[in-house]
C-alpha cells in the first residue's frame, strides 16, 4: 500500500473534522447563523475592480504555520495583522482556518475580519457543503475550492452551495489538467494558479505564465505562492497578471503591511510605519 501524501492525510482528517463539527452544531443551526451574519463584502468585485485599474490586487494571508515550514510567525495577533495589511494596501484577506496542519482557527477569521473593512476568504480544505455554510456563518466573503482535492461533481456541488449563501468562490489549480476541469465545471471569475508543485513543493512562477494563455479573458488570474521581490511582481504585471495571493513573505516580516507596501506599492513610501505592528 502506498504511503498517503500530505494532501491525502489532510483530506482524511478533514472528513473526520466535519463529522465532529456536525455532531456539535447541526446544518440547520449553521444555516440560521449564516442568514444573520454580516453581509458579504464582495471579494470578487474588489479584486476585479482593482485589477481593471492595472493596480496590484493583493490577497494578503493571515497564516501562522504550514506543514512544510512549521511555525512561520511566533507572535500572531490576527487583528493587528489585518489592520496592518489594510494600511499597506491589501485588497482582500486570506485567513487559514485549518487547525491540525496550519495551526489556524475559525476565531482568527472572525478576529481579522472584525478588525478591518476588507473582504475575507476562508482558506481551508473544503470537502463538504457543511463547511461552505459554516464559512458564511463565520462571516467569510469567499471560499477556496482546490481542484486537486475534489472530483468534478463535488466541486460543482460546493460551488452551488456557496452561491446559494452569497459566497464568492476562488478555484485553485496547479496544472493544465486541473485548469481544464475548473473551467469546465465552474463559472467563478476567480482562478488561482498555485506555483507550488504539490509533489516536490518546489515553487516556480513559470507555472502561472505557462497556464495564462489557456485562461479566458473573462476570468481573473490570481498568482499564488513564490512572490518574494519586486522583480517577481513586475514579471507578473508585464505578463498581464495583477492579482496576487501572498502569505509567507509577509508573515516573516516584522511589519506585514509595510512589507506589502514595499513589495507592491513602493511609490507610496512608508505610510504604514505607524501601524500597530511597529
Swiss-Prot record:
Q: Which InterPro entries match?
A: Aldolase_TIM, Indole-3-glycerol_P_synth, Indole-3-glycerol_P_synth_dom, Indole-3-GlycerolPSynthase_CS, RibuloseP-bd_barrel
Q: What pathway is this protein said to act in by its record?
A: Amino-acid biosynthesis; L-tryptophan biosynthesis; L-tryptophan from chorismate: step 4/5
Enzyme Commission number(s): 4.1.1.48
Sorted alphabetically, the keyword list is: Amino-acid biosynthesis, Aromatic amino acid biosynthesis, Decarboxylase, Lyase, Tryptophan biosynthesis
Q: What Gene3D superfamilies does the entry give?
A: Aldolase class I
Q: Name one GO biological process term.
A: L-tryptophan biosynthetic process
Q: Which reaction does it catalyse?
A: 1-(2-carboxyphenylamino)-1-deoxy-D-ribulose 5-phosphate + H(+) = (1S,2R)-1-C-(indol-3-yl)glycerol 3-phosphate + CO2 + H2O
Concerning PROSITE patterns, the annotation shows: IGPS
Tell me where on the tree of life, at the top rank, the source sits: Bacteria
One example GO MF annotation: indole-3-glycerol-phosphate synthase activity
What family, per the record?
Belongs to the TrpC family.
What protein name does the entry list? Indole-3-glycerol phosphate synthase
Amino acid at each position: 500500500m502506498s504511503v498517503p501524501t500530505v494532501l491525502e492525510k489532510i483530506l482524511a482528517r478533514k472528513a473526520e473534522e466535519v463529522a465532529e463539527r456536525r455532531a456539535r452544531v447541526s446544518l440547520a443551526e449553521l444555516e440560521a447563523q449564516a442568514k444573520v451574519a454580516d453581509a458579504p463584502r464582495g471579494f470578487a468585485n474588489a479584486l476585479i475592480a482593482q485589477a481593471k485599474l492595472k493596480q496590484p490586487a493583493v490577497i494578503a494571508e493571515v497564516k501562522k504555520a504550514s506543514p512544510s515550514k512549521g511555525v512561520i510567525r511566533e507572535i500572531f495577533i490576527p487583528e493587528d495583522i489585518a489592520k496592518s495589511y489594510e494600511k499597506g494596501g491589501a485588497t482582500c484577506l486570506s485567513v487559514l482556518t485549518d487547525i491540525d496542519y496550519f495551526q489556524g482557527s475559525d476565531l482568527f477569521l472572525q478576529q481579522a475580519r472584525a478588525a478591518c473593512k476588507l473582504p475575507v476568504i476562508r482558506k481551508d480544505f473544503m470537502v463538504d457543503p457543511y463547511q461552505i455554510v459554516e464559512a458564511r456563518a463565520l462571516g467569510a466573503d469567499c471560499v477556496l475550492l482546490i481542484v486537486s482535492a475534489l472530483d468534478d461533481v463535488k466541486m460543482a456541488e460546493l460551488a452551488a452551495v456557496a452561491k446559494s449563501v452569497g459566497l464568492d468562490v476562488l478555484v485553485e489549480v496547479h496544472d493544465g489538467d486541473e485548469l481544464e476541469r475548473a473551467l469546465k465545471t465552474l463559472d467563478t471569475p476567480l482562478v488561482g494558479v498555485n506555483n507550488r508543485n504539490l509533489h516536490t513543493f518546489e515553487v516556480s512562477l513559470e507555472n502561472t505564465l505557462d497556464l495564462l494563455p489557456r485562461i479566458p479573458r473573462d476570468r481573473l488570474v490570481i498568482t499564488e505562492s513564490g512572490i518574494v521581490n519586486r522583480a517577481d511582481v513586475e514579471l507578473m504585471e508585464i505578463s498581464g497578471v495583477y492579482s496576487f495571493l501572498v502569505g509567507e513573505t509577509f508573515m516573516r516580516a516584522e511589519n506585514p503591511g509595510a512589507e506589502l507596501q514595499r513589495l507592491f506599492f513602493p511609490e507610496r513610501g512608508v505610510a504604514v510605519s505607524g501601524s500597530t505592528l511597529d
